[in-house]
């Protein structure tokens, strides 16, 4: 995906013009210095050329966006059907309402992927792009918070365990996720027909807030869960957060949070990159981290399916069946 652009080559006219201007200033200010090496002058002129990076997610990456979106929608829809299917064993999964919300978040992300994909025309409005980024990050923030609650509360999230707990968490988590998306919604728009984040001095506060939100949700939250798990185990204070296969979700977003933080430091000139190669490496990491984050909408339904399969196979013999399930099983037993 993408076409790599190497260091810009100066045209003969540009090179001659630059050389003439440089020599005029040098001669008038310091006099002619015949000992100035030609090689050093060429190296300095080459170093002053613009630094171009390889954009992996350009127009040629459109098939990747479309395929990921289609697969994500199909996989999320299948998981939602299984979770809401009457008298299906996946409804016995601990905290299945939270799992259903994870599938909804993954489906929302999958739907909005084509909106932000390059190569789908040049008439997209800033409002559509802002809405796309709002759903993009809002669904991701909500999924991360849902995973944190599912790991911390575990079996107490089951239907009927704590009255009103699931509803309260649902409203709170999606409300917080919506608030966290306000900075990126206001700092995004359309430029040259592409949806992009707008970097400017006026929007620097919004960009900083968005970066902090990504670092907190995608980087610090999983680190906090791992830390709490290890600390409680070391101190003998109980099992700690419930570790399961769903934690693999953070693998897809953790690099995005880290690289986004580095990019903000570079743009704010708090971290200086001395070479063009370092800037190209950072741009490449940004593209790779974004591509990995996009793939989560396909991986999340698979993780949910694997978790529900493992949980029901392990917990089904020890879980009390709801009344509807008991009568259904009794009917099946009498028929046999």
Curated annotation (Swiss-Prot):
This is Atypical chemokine receptor 1. One of its GO terms (biological process) is inflammatory response. Sulfation at Tyr-41 facilitates interaction with MGSA/CXCL1, RANTES/CCL5 and MCP-1/CCL2 but not IL8/CXCL8. Sulfation at Tyr-30 facilitates interaction with IL8/CXCL8. (Microbial infection) Sulfation at Tyr-41 facilitates interaction with Plasmodium vivax Duffy receptor (PVDR). Sulfation at Tyr-30/Tyr-41 and Tyr-41 alone increases binding affinity of Plasmodium vivax parasites and likely promotes invasion of red blood cells. GO terms for cellular component: early endosome; plasma membrane; recycling endosome. Residues 1-63, 117-129, 188-207, 266-287 are extracellular. Changing residue 28 to A: Does not affect interaction with Plasmodium vivax Duffy receptor (PVDR). Glycans are attached at residues 16, 33. PANTHER family: ATYPICAL CHEMOKINE RECEPTOR 1, DUFFY ANTIGEN/CHEMOKINE RECEPTOR. Signal peptide: none annotated. It comes from Homo sapiens (Human). The chain crosses the membrane at residues 64-84, 96-116, 130-153, 167-187, 208-228, 245-265, 288-308. Belongs to the G-protein coupled receptor 1 family. Atypical chemokine receptor subfamily. The modification Sulfotyrosine is found at residues 30, 41. Changing residue 18 to A: Does not affect interaction with Plasmodium vivax Duffy receptor (PVDR). Keywords: Blood group antigen, Disulfide bond, Endosome, G-protein coupled receptor, Glycoprotein, Membrane, Receptor, Sulfation, Transducer, Transmembrane, Transmembrane helix. Residues 1-30 are annotated as: Mediates Plasmodium vivax Duffy receptor (PVDR) binding. CDD domains: 7tmA_ACKR1_DARC.
């Amino acid at each position: 995906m993408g076409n790599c652009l190497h260091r810009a080559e100066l045209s003969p006219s540009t090179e001659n013009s630059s050389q003439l201007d440089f020599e005029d200033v040098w001669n008038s200010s310091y006099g002619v210095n015949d000992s100035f090496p030609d090689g050093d002058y060429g190296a300095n002129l080459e170093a002053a050329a613009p630094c171009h990076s390889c954009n992996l997610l350009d127009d040629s990456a459109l098939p990747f966006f479309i395929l990921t979106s289609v697969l994500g929608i199909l996989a999320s829809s299948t998981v939602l059907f299984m979770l809401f299917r009457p008298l299906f064993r996946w409804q016995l999964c601990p905290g299945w309402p939270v799992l259903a919300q994870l599938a909804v978040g993954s489906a929302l992300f999958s739907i909005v992927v084509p909106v932000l994909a390059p190569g789908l025309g040049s008439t997209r409005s800033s409002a559509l792009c802002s809405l796309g980024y709002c759903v993009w990050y809002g669904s991701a923030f909500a999924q991360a918070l849902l995973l944190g609650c599912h790991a911390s509360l575990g079996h107490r999230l089951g239907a009927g365990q704590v009255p009103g707990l699931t509803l309260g968490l649902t409203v709170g988590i999606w409300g917080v996720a919506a608030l966290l998306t306000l900075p990126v919604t206001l700092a995004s728009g359309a430029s040259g027909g592409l949806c992009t984040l707008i970097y400017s001095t006026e929007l620097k506060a919004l960009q900083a807030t968005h970066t902090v939100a990504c670092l907190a949700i995608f980087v610090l939250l999983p680190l906090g869960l791992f830390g709490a798990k290890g600390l409680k185990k070391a101190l003998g204070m109980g099992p700690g957060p419930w570790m399961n296969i769903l934690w693999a979700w953070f693998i897809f977003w953790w690099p995005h949070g880290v690289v986004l933080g580095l990019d903000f430091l570079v743009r704010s000139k708090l971290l200086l990159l001395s070479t063009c190669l370092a800037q190209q490496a950072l741009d490449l990491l940004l593209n790779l981290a974004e591509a990995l984050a996009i793939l989560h909408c396909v991986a999340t339904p698979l993780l949910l399916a694997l978790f529900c399969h493992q949980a029901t196979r392990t917990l089904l013999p020890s879980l009390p069946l709801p009344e509807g399930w008991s009568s259904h099983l009794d009917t099946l037993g009498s028929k046999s």
